[in-house]
Amino acid sequence: MRTFPHLLSARSVCNFCLDRNYGHNMNASTVMARLRVRPADHPASVSVRTLLGETAWFSLPATTRARFADHAASAEYRGEFAEVRASFAGRLLAMCCRLIGTPVAPFTGTNIPATVKVFATPDGGTAWQRIYEFPGREPCVVESIKRLSREGTLIEALPACLRMALDVYARDGVLHFVSNAYYFELGRMRIRVLDWLPPGTTHVEHIDLGNGSFRFTMRVRHRWLGEVFYQTGCFRDPASPSASR
């Protein structure tokens, strides 16, 4: 029987997801390997400032600019998700996705303590790791990497070679990331996910709240299924006095 050593079995993935140390084994190489991200042939740093343009960039609060500045790629934010919810279709999709990784939290709840870790990858990308502490469960870890595509546009690398193409813009002092396509990246080949398939359009908002804190809100909405996922929470800057526990 022909084997494919680069593919994980369902059993190994399940064991991997339940590893107590998973959320603490964090460095650029391991995260890139988990997300099957190949180092870029021509590394280029993700610059939100460049993607937005100077006018839009300086319309954002100074604290938002500091969090997304080119030199600010390493930080740890602590806070709480006031709400993590999903529709029936969303919960089903999240549970199925646990066989290939965890692109979205598979559980729901309110007032969920969480930690967000951000750090740079060797090829200029920015890795994001969200650790949810649902009551009575092992920490749930969701990872992704924002990086530039071959064409210089912004994408987010998710588990199982899934990629999400993103538009980024600023409006009324809020930073927005909105998906415009999903595709699987297999080497140099791309297989686009049809627009009518789940999950739908992902919309992330970064809202500065002042006093060293911000709100993260994510909505995923499908054209037919409606709202599939919704998360919102407040987090504190590492330098904020209230960040220490």
What residue spans do the PLM features occupy?
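Short beta-strand-initiation
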Residues: P5-H6, R163
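Soluble ligand-binding/transfer domains with enclosed cavities or grooves
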Residues: A28-G210, F214-V220, Q231
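Serine residues within intrinsically disordered or low-complexity segments
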Residues: S9-S12
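Low-complexity, intrinsically disordered or signal/transmembrane-proximal segments
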Residues: H6, Y22-H24
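Cysteine-centered motifs
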Residues: C14-C17
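C-terminal structured interaction module
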Residues: F216-R245
